[in-house]
Amino acid sequence: MKIDFLTLFPEMFEGVLHSSILKKAQEKEAVSFNVVNFREYSDHKHKTVDDYPYGGGAGMVLKAQPVFDAVEDLTNKASKKPRIILVCPQGERYTQKKAEELAKEEHLMFICGHYEGYDERIREHLVTDEISIGDFVLTGGELPAMMIADSVVRLLPHVLGKEASHIEDSFSTGLLEHPHYTRPADYKGLKVPDVLLSGNHAKIEEWRRKESLKRTYTRRPDLIDSCKTLTEEEKRWLWQLHND
């Protein structure tokens, strides 16, 4: 997979793209990153990329020209047309399901904006997806783009050490993940549940599933309604939990 980031602040990506899973993914040649300062595409003599909004109002708006030229240049150099993603508060709420969808692509391109917003022609004529990571405001699109890229890259084949790791993550099954414990079994009187020390794998899996259901029900009940993996027994157990 290839991932392009169009940004005015390329230095923001240096640490993230060269650390942890993203670094390992590049070493395994599962992904390559290309960080592009789209200011370089500005046709203004001072390389200006923003201007005042027509009709007045506060803030500055990113101009269409440098973004269009950057996207067109990178797309023309690509072997396949990329999925072009605009990260913005107005976009579709990002989910694990969306991450799995994007992980099937060969080429992603993120447009990371700043200022008040984008010239609407960018949104209407360039992008294939608009994505939001939540109902809050950030200074720019760089952090959301990096978050999305991280969640996508870890789904690529052979990136994680244990291939099943991402399947067991929260949201991959439609539920929050169960609690985890490690050594020592007793820390200052705080003990690991006995079932995890029993060696009975069937009982352990049953405990993990119930804890996952319980945690999801108490913290994110909205996910229970959309979960399609519940058995009839689990539905009865949740009903009992609800009535307790």
From Swiss-Prot:
Alphabetical UniProt keywords: Cytoplasm, Methyltransferase, S-adenosyl-L-methionine, Transferase, tRNA processing
SUPFAM superfamilies per UniProt? alpha/beta knot
Enzyme class, first EC level, given as a word: transferase
Spell out where the chain crosses the membrane: none
Q: Where in the cell is it found?
A: Cytoplasm
Pfam families in alphabetical order: tRNA_m1G_MT
Q: Which InterPro entries match?
A: Alpha/beta_knot_MTases, tRNA_m1G_MeTrfase_C_sf, tRNA_m1G_MeTrfase_TrmD, tRNA_m1G_MTases_N, tRNA_MeTrfase_TRMD/TRM10
The record's GO CC annotations read: cytosol
Q: EC number(s) per UniProt?
A: 2.1.1.228
Catalytically driven reaction(s): guanosine(37) in tRNA + S-adenosyl-L-methionine = N(1)-methylguanosine(37) in tRNA + S-adenosyl-L-homocysteine + H(+)
Q: Where does S-adenosyl-L-methionine bind?
A: 113, 133-138
Q: Which domain of life is it from?
A: Bacteria
Where mainly found? Answer: cytoplasm
Q: Which CDD domains is this protein grouped with?
A: TrmD-like
Which BP terms in the Gene Ontology apply to this protein? Answer: tRNA N1-guanine methylation
What is an example of a GO molecular function annotated in this UniProt entry? tRNA (guanine(37)-N1)-methyltransferase activity
Record family assignment = Belongs to the RNA methyltransferase TrmD family.
Quaternary structure, from the entry: Homodimer.
What is the role of this chain? Specifically methylates guanosine-37 in various tRNAs.
**By what name is this protein known?**
tRNA (guanine-N(1)-)-methyltransferase
Q: Which organism is it from?
A: Bacillus pumilus (strain SAFR-032)
List the lineage, top down: Bacteria, Bacillati, Bacillota, Bacilli, Bacillales
Gene coding for it: trmD
